Amino acid sequence: MKESEDLASIIQMELDKRLNTPNRGVKQAGFYVLIGASMPNVLVEVGFLSNPMEEKKLKQNMYKQQIAEAIYSAIKHFKQTREKVLAGE
């Protein structure tokens, strides 16, 4: 779904702006949890607990807040863009 890919790219861009983490890019796969959804959907992975440095970051409240704000900002941007497209602007 093109919209899902667009949303994923915007989320990745926002995460890149706010976090000092490796950009592993946007990938597509038939994730079971996303199959059958009728709306744009993405699976966001922001780190791996198997990586000690990432685990340490994921335990920090400020880091989790930055992740949440990045995702919120991306969804807001995506929604505003879609509304303009649907309105013919």
Could you say what each language-model-derived stretch is?
Residues 1-89:
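Active-site-proximal helix/loop segments of hydrolytic enzymes
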